[in-house]
Amino acid sequence: MKLKTNFCERFYNLSPRICIYDLDGTVIDSSHRIKLHDNGSLDLDHWKQNCTRDQIFKDDLLPLYWQLVSDYKQGNYIVICTAREMTEIDLEFIHSMGIYYDKIISRPKGNTTVDHVLKKSQLRYFWNLKPFKNISKSFYDDNENNLKAINSLGIGTVFNAGEWNNRYL
């Protein structure tokens, strides 16, 4: 198993931005594994049943992946923030696809907190702690509730990944 994404040429940026990317529906197309309930919510049991190596490796990259690569090469600090419970298979896929990152923040095992509350809580320190407070931040996600939650933290730019990707599909 490959344990780290192959490195590419990367600019040493003295004033990097913090670029935060969701995975599913943002950088990765995992829609073939999704089933929704009648009310539109995610069928989590179906999702977990389809988190096998065979199913995960059928996922594909979305156009926003290239923005992530560009941000990484420009020396920005790349954070992957996902509501997935990350597994070894997920990491293997991320590394095999060349998805560059400096930090991954994911759902703790067994945590059932709604996505936008979880992500806001997990990312809050980038807005509150002194070393990060005055650094420019960008947040990319396809979920409107997540965008609103992160936007409520204050200064930063949020991008609707669904709209972004649809421009290029």
Where are these regions (language model features)?
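Alpha-helical substrate-recognition element adjacent to the catalytic core
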Residues: K2-T113
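Conserved Lys-Pro-Asp/Glu-containing loop-to-beta segment of HAD-superfamily phosphomonoesterases
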Residues: R17, K119-E144
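Residues in intrinsically disordered, low-complexity segments of regulatory proteins
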Residues: H46-K48, F126, E163
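Secondary-structure boundary/capping motif
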Residues: D71-K73, K119, G162-E163
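Structural alpha-beta junctions
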Residues: Q74, I99-I104, K130-K133, S152-N160
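Short, aromatic/basic amphipathic alpha-helical patches
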Residues: L91-G98, F126, K148-I155
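Short, charged, surface-exposed secondary-structure boundary motifs
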Residues: T112-V117, R167-L169
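Acidic, Mg2+-coordinating phosphoryl-transfer loop and its flanking beta/alpha structural elements
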Residues: N134-L169
